[in-house]
Curated annotation (Swiss-Prot):
Matching InterPro entries: ArnB_NH2Trfase, DegT/StrS_aminotransferase, PyrdxlP-dep_Trfase, PyrdxlP-dep_Trfase_major, PyrdxlP-dep_Trfase_small
Example GO molecular function: UDP-4-amino-4-deoxy-L-arabinose aminotransferase
Keyword terms, alphabetized: Aminotransferase, Antibiotic resistance, Lipid A biosynthesis, Lipid biosynthesis, Lipid metabolism, Lipopolysaccharide biosynthesis, Pyridoxal phosphate, Transferase
Name listed for the protein in its UniProt record: UDP-4-amino-4-deoxy-L-arabinose--oxoglutarate aminotransferase
PANTHER family, alphabetized: TRANSAMINASE, UDP-4-AMINO-4-DEOXY-L-ARABINOSE--OXOGLUTARATE AMINOTRANSFERASE
Subunit description: Homodimer.
GO BP terms, alphabetized: lipid A biosynthetic process; lipopolysaccharide biosynthetic process; response to antibiotic
Cofactor annotation: pyridoxal 5'-phosphate
Catalytic activity: UDP-4-amino-4-deoxy-beta-L-arabinose + 2-oxoglutarate = UDP-beta-L-threo-pentopyranos-4-ulose + L-glutamate
EC number: 2.6.1.87
Residues recorded with modification N6-(pyridoxal phosphate)lysine: 182
Protein family per UniProt: Belongs to the DegT/DnrJ/EryC1 family. ArnB subfamily.
């Protein structure tokens, strides 16, 4: 049997290994000069005014919502078609997640669905850029501005994504992920970007004990050893070991995303050429640059003769990995029991059928051919 083809694999090379070695030899391995450089370089890459490195996108979402004052009595609009961390954070802050449906073929929220969900208690909207494609931001921004509601973009899938010629993160507030499967990785990490000076200051304080200053700042800038705690905060800072990896990855991003785009185009070509009964997501109609974080197909048993779970198992039996992005949050036990009446037709239809095929920069067209051959064999059986 052929070697296992994983669903995802980080593109780690000698440069990342050398960067980590340099940090280990430097004597400063926690938050320090690598973080500062990463934040500056991320601002340059996205055009953002402020970038604040954190230990995960989840941590970034937590301190951002806290900085906005989200709490009991508030509602936050978000898709159910997302990773549950966002719902968990909203819930843990005492607020209510208002889960809305997505477009059937984009898996992204629409301005119409958001507008229908707004109430006097709505405090924030969190649209999700999905699989590397950008949500249609202009009408959502206009809606949020008219209503005076905070807008926080979940950009965990969108490093290198652009909307109407503008990098995601250049305007407003967005949160990126450096998790192991993301287009830029440092194993675990994230970045909050914003053009709001006050929000940036609050996020920076909340992510480090409420101090607004870290150990490296105190040493290099001569501040008092015991800085003032201005508000209770968390320890969500990113270590320089991780930041060094992320810096190398960020420099490689155009090349890495170009490889992903070529592989995605080849997948689309082969699916069409072999007339396989699997529907990929539609690319957005609005001008954009796709980061191709994921390559997702929908497996409908009525068309293919096999359901999604069986398809994933059959791929596994052929030593091919796959993923599920995502099981709808409102179908998870806690949220299912908390919101038993909630029905989201397009989200549920997709949640039962979506399958993420292998896609990572070090893949080859031969690997895609192998996946396509496996899909063909599975449906023919």
């Amino acid at each position: 049997m052929k070697d296992f083809l994983p669903f995802s694999k980080p593109a780690i090379g000698d440069e990342e290994i050398a960067a980590v070695s340099e940090v280990l030899r430097s004597g400063w391995i926690t938050t320090g000069p690598q973080n500062q450089a990463l934040e500056q370089e991320f601002c340059q890459a996205t055009g953002a005014r402020h970038a604040i490195a954190v230990c995960s996108a989840t941590a970034g979402m937590h301190v951002t919502l806290m900085a906005l004052g989200i709490g009991p009595g508030d509602e936050v609009i978000t898709p159910s078609m997302t990773w549950v961390s966002t719902l968990n954070i909203i819930t843990l802050l005492g607020a209510t997640p208002v889960m809305i449906d997505v477009g059937r073929d984009t898996l992204m929220v629409t301005p119409e669905a958001i507008a229908d969900a707004i109430t006097p208690r709505t405090k924030a909207i969190i649209p999700v850029h999905f699989a590397g494609a950008p949500v249609d931001l202009d009408p959502i921004r206009a809606l949020a501005q008219r209503q005076g509601i905070a807008l926080i973009e979940d950009a965990a899938h969108a490093i290198g994504t652009a909307y109407r010629g503008e990098p995601i993160g250049q305007r407003g507030t967005a949160i990126f992920s450096f998790h192991a499967i993301k287009n830029v990785t440092c194993a675990e990490g994230g970045m909050v970007v914003t053009d709001d000076d006050r929000l940036a200051q609050q996020v920076r304080s909340l992510k480090f004990h409420g101090l607004g200053v870290d150990a490296y700042d105190r040493q290099t800038h001569g501040r008092a050893p015991q800085a003032e705690v201005v508000t209770p905060g968390y320890k969500y800072n990113l270590a320089d070991i991780n930041a060094a990896i992320a810096r190398v990855q960020l420099a490689k991003l155009p090349e890495l995303n170009a490889r992903r785009a070529r592989l995605a185009a080849y997948y689309l070509q082969q699916l069409a050429q072999h007339q396989l009964p699997f529907s990929p997501l539609n690319t957005p109609e609005w001008p954009h640059q796709h980061a191709w974080h994921l390559f997702i197909i929908r497996c409908d048993e009525a068309r293919s003769g096999v359901d999604r779970d069986r398809l994933m198992q059959a791929l596994k039996e052929r030593n091919i990995g796959s993923g599920l992005h995502f099981r709808a949050a409102h179908t998870q036990k806690y949220y299912r029991e908390s919101y038993p009446q909630l029905r989201l037709a397009q989200t549920e239809w997709n949640s039962q059928r979506i399958c993420s095929l292998p896609l990572f920069p070090d893949m080859t067209e031969a690997d895609v051919d192998r996946v396509i051959a496996a899909l063909k064999e599975i449906i023919e059986q």
